[in-house]
């Protein structure tokens, strides 16, 4: 349907922001329901992929795609396993299509914020899980993401804490990171 509408209008999409997402807390197999798990995969992975694939043919040089990922992409997060896996997909997908679209002059940026006070957390529940992690200011995240996209950066991680987390996740054994991120 989206592709048909874009074709009808002879659209020239300048910016695509894949911001829809959801998460759930709870252990997979018990705690998180199958419906919750599939909702996360369907929205965070399948919908993002299909919307992107549908819109790309309607983009020209100078267009930008912004995908909302998360610091959860850097390391598996117990009790948010499916969410962190879905965001790892978003980051990997972004890196891959950024390279594929670069010759066409289309830039792709993944923003990887930490927790933010948005409607996302009302739906995900378990707000206390993130009590010790510095929260991101949504307005600052958006401003930084726009700057990063304009510069053609493939990844943008706001705040010093989140940048440090990304760095540590790259150098420490995954087993240690999983233990540290157990929420």
Segments predicted by a language model, with ranges:
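Active-site loop-to-helix junction immediately N-terminal to the catalytic Tyr of the SDR YXXXK motif
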Residues: 76-84, 96
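Conserved hydrophobic beta-strands of the Rossmann-like cofactor-binding core
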Residues: 13-17
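Conserved mid-core segment of classical short-chain dehydrogenase/reductases
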Residues: 23-38, 79
């Amino acid at each position: 349907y989206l592709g048909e509408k874009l074709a009808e209008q002879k659209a020239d999409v300048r910016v695509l922001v894949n911001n829809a997402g959801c998460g759930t807390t709870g252990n997979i197999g018990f705690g998180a329901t199958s419906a919750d798990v599939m909702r996360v995969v369907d929205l965070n992975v399948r919908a993002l992929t299909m919307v992107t694939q549908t819109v790309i043919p309607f983009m020209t040089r100078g267009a930008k795609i912004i995908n909302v990922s998360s610091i959860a992409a850097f390391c598996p997060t117990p009790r948010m396993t499916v969410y962190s896996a879905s965001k790892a997909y978003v980051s990997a997908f972004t890196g891959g299509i950024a390279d594929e679209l670069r010759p066409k002059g289309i830039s792709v940026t993944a923003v990887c914020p930490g927790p933010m006070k948005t409607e996302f957390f009302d739906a995900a529940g378990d707000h206390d899980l993130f009590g010790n992690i510095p929260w991101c200011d949504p307005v600052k995240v958006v401003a930084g993401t726009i700057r990063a996209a304009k510069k053609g950066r493939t990844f943008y991680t706001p705040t010093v804490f989140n940048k440090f987390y990304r760095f540590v996740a790259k150098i420490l054994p995954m087993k240690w990171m999983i233990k540290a991120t157990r929420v």
